[in-house]
Amino acid sequence: MIDLAAVEQALALLFTNFSPWMVVVPGIIIGLIFGATPGLQISMAMAIFLPMTLYMDFVQAMLFLTAIFTGGSFGSGIPAILMNIPGTSSAIATAFDGYPMARQGKHNQALGVALASSVIGVLMGYLILFLMIQPLSFMVLKLGPAEMFAVILWGMTLIATLRGEHMLKGLMAGFVGMLVGTIGFNELGMARGTMGQTFLLDGVPVIPAMMGMFAASELFKLANKGYIVESEASRKVKISEIFQGFKMAVTYPWVLIRGGFIGVFVGAVPGVGSSVSNLLSYVETQRRDKDPSSFGKGNPKGVVASESANSTSEAGSMATLLALGIPGGGATAVMLAAFAMHNITGGPQFIRQQTDVVYAIIFANFAQVFLLMVIGLLFIPLLANIVKVPMRYLIPSVLVLAVMGSFGLTGNMTGPATVLIFAVVGWLLRHYGYSVPAAVIGMLLGAMAEKSLLHSYQISGGNLAYVLERPVTLIILALLLISLFGQHLVNWFRRRRQPLGA
């Protein structure tokens, strides 16, 4: 139920003086820069600038950190579209169709689609948060480790179906990725798959591996090309085409709405967030489309699905932070630290006692959406010029960027070595028709799946009947089976219903 008195107080907090808004534009710019730079994480940006929030009041601090979050969510899609390097794991699906659009000379439209989808996604996400923060937090509390494991398996199954007729290859790639993701210490302190190498005790660095498999392996294919976009006329940066991308995104309202709801609800699950939601949204959009084979070849619906879910995930993770005091991921973990610095404890009591502050944070993000649109439009033409750079300069530049970013993440040569090794792995997967995205997602979710499975085993005492007592788990497992066999069953029934003479 909406507290109208708290709404009035929230508006007073935001608009009585201009000071809360002084930090929003710098925050969005910081987020855009960190999100658009491969190897730099949104949570890293927030952590670096966290000490500055000591000199702000709580509302101003939240506006600053959420502005970084908002800018970074869009920024991570820019290198995914222009260079096939997702700035963060939340932009993996953006690269599936965004990069092919750029290769076709539609980089301006692709960036416009991404910006419009991000803007609408943030707006939709915080609107859902405003209306549903309390019931949403109650639903999240119902999800235990068994449900988490089922969600991860379902997500992996959906990613595998991206291969269409090569589903088995997709499943195999995802399974191998999950095995790689479990290398290192497990929850019980046991080391697995390290082959005696101490640098693997902490596991394979996922972000450098992702850079290698997506970006560096793609460079092998482009080595004999002159430019990313071969046509000189198509390499021009045109504001009019960026606005065409804006209009294009709005023509797919159901894709935006579906991505928005997937982003909010999956983003609200701690530890899952936008890394999974953008992929689930992409796969669901492809599955429901009249021409699923066009995805992965430059279909703008793929960019819309990914970016809308990616952006609304922010609101979902904020729901668990505000309503339960539980961070949904790295970015909201930094926000939780800001809560502690200002002697604030998130949770049901916080919502009841400081509803005006909660509403102020939500309303401020409505305004941030329009600032993101303006700043994004100024930012895009600058970055879109990358398609004008000859490949003889771009390939070494991207490799140096990937190597430097990976070194910054690990602090030693493990990161650069991981990039190069997984570049070869990515090239081999592409060459033999296996799904690179499925392998990467398997790596991202492998440790999470193992942790959830172990906790489920400990809670149930090894009793499989425990699953039968969890209706949500059964529903998710049913969805998993539908995603695997649903289309085959539909086709079978259609054949049965056709007259014999037809």
Each PLM stretch: what is its role?
Residues I48, L82-Q109, P135, G144, ...:
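Flexible loop linkers connecting adjacent transmembrane helices
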Residues F69-A80, N299-L324, G328, G346-I375:
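A structural-propensity feature for long, helix-poor, extended segments
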Residues G112-Y227, M341-R495:
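Membrane-embedded alpha-helical modules
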Residues I33-S43, I81-I92, M124-I128, V266-V276, ...:
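Short helix-coil transition sites and intra-membrane helix breaks within transmembrane domains
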Residues M1-A61, G193-N299, A384-N385, L401-F407, ...:
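Helix-loop-helix hairpins and the membrane-proximal interhelical loops
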Residues Q41-M52, L65, A80-P100, L131, ...:
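Re-entrant/interfacial helical elements at transmembrane boundaries that shape
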Residues P26-I42, G71-N84, I159-G164, F261-P270, ...:
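Transmembrane alpha-helix interface/packing and boundary motifs in multi-pass membrane proteins
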Residues V59-L63, P100-S117, K290-G302, G330-A333, ...:
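Membrane-interface alpha-helices at helix entry/exit sites of multi-pass transporters
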